[in-house]
């Protein structure tokens, strides 16, 4: 089987994976269920590989998947303006150069204690 169903329809599953991938790129570490962590590892590694390529086509492919969310906002006192960085800009300017010498294996999954409500196996997925 090429993917996990995760108890959702295909459109819901794709939306959830896009959201989790974007959240991981912004925060660099998230807590989720073990199955979701294993599933988003594939897409995050693909996005970082696109970021390492760095050309226009790779940027457009990544933009088609990663949500257009603000990763950080900075205030410049001199110009009295706010500057914001999107998740896509962070991927190409900060994350991809960090892994320039690394061939794959950009994420780490750490298993944690089960969730309190339903005892679902939980995990922390983070960028190495």
From Swiss-Prot:
GO terms for molecular function: structural constituent of ribosome. Signal peptide: none annotated. GO terms for biological process: translation. InterPro entries: Ribosomal_bL17, Ribosomal_bL17_CS, Ribosomal_bL17_sf. It holds the Pfam family Ribosomal_L17. Gene3D superfamilies: Ribosomal protein L17. One of its GO terms (cellular component) is cytosolic large ribosomal subunit. Keywords: Ribonucleoprotein, Ribosomal protein. Belongs to the bacterial ribosomal protein bL17 family. NCBIfam families: L17 (TIGR00059). Part of the 50S ribosomal subunit. Contacts protein L32. This is Large ribosomal subunit protein bL17.
